[in-house]
Amino acid sequence: MKQTVTMIIEQDPESGWYGCDLDGTLAEYHGFEGLDKIGAPVGVDSPDSALNTVKKWIAEGRDVRILSARISHDPKGDGKAAIEAWTEQYLGRALPVTEKKDAKMITLLDDRAVQVEENTGRIVGGAKALQAAGDAHRQGEKGR
């Protein structure tokens, strides 16, 4: 007889983690130039920027991690080391780096993500939001 096990994970801010993309979200990005080439921080003077939000989360003692595709093909760990050094320099400490999200991730700040309403699949902002995201990505690719 087969048994089914259902696991419910509650989003407890004390036990989960907060993710933030690097390229184009925390750091300037105009196309890939190498694992160890990371742009200058963006949004330094904007209180509601991703950079300052991450700094606030760190000050509040939250578990903050960098979620970056940059390290998905990084066998020697050069990209990960560069990201850790960048976060130490601009955020005050080396943050953990991953290329994967998991069930404990509470939220993600990312320049390429488009918000989808939970359990409906509806794109928040509709087709306009999707079009704007595509346009922004194409514009960034032209800057290379």
What would you call each of these model-derived segments?
Residues M1-G143:
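Catalytic phosphate/metal-binding cores of nucleic-acid and nucleotide-processing enzymes, i.e., regions
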